Amino acid sequence: MPRYLGPRFKKIRRLGALPGLTNKSPKAGSDLRKQPRSRKKSQYRIRLEEKQKLCFHYGLREYQLLNYVRIAAKAKGPTGQVLLQLLEMRLDNILFRLGMASTIPAARQLVNHRHILVNGRIVDRPSYRCKPRDIIMTKDNQKSRTLIQNSLGSSPQKELPNHLTLHPFQYKGLVNQIIDSKWVGLKINELLVVEYYSRQTKA
């Protein structure tokens, strides 16, 4: 599955809120009269849609998510929780959760265009796995700071997860610890995603 570049509203109508993809949300009952009454979803369809939520929210291709599932399966702890921790600790997601980018695609652009430093060094990989005590900040130039300032000014005020600290006037964020599962930024049943891939490998 390639990275999704199509209409975002269409996806959130089908899958629900995907804050990493877009900060818009469908109005309650929107387009209900236009949609035919759907049949009861199969278990496969339910698992597939949970997997798609992760891909669209975090901006992952199919093979990338599969790699994360494999890494999580080999780690200590419940596979689903470890999977979400791995995704939440990506640099592009950390920038998004800090409010330094309005969406994960916007955060990815900041990283790809070399506007972001981690511990004083430019990091241009959105998938960089952040660690406790990492310091994330913008380059010391007007263009980079303006991009972050615009995002901080336009992003809706949300409670910052407890594994992060933001210093907005310094254009800097700190990673305090590995994220706790209750602070994950997406409503998701991660066990269904793990089940989806385990059943795919057995098929």
Swiss-Prot record:
State the SMART domains in the record. Ribosomal_S4, S4
Region (Disordered), start-end ranges: 19-43
Provide one Gene Ontology biological process annotation. translation
GO MF: rRNA binding; structural constituent of ribosome
Protein keywords: Chloroplast, Plastid, Ribonucleoprotein, Ribosomal protein, RNA-binding, rRNA-binding
Q: Does the keyword RNA-binding apply?
A: yes
Q: What is its main location?
A: plastid
Q: Which Gene3D superfamilies match?
A: Ribosomal Protein S4 Delta 41, Chain A, domain 1 (1.10.1050.10), RNA-binding S4 domain (3.10.290.10)
Task: Tell me the compartments it is located in.
Answer: Plastid, Chloroplast
S4 RNA-binding domain boundaries: 89-152
Q: What does this protein do?
A: One of the primary rRNA binding proteins, it binds directly to 16S rRNA where it nucleates assembly of the body of the 30S subunit.
Q: Which family does it belong to?
A: Belongs to the universal ribosomal protein uS4 family.
Q: Which NCBIfam families match?
A: PRK05327.1, rpsD_bact
Stated name of the protein: Small ribosomal subunit protein uS4c
Per the record, the gene is rps4
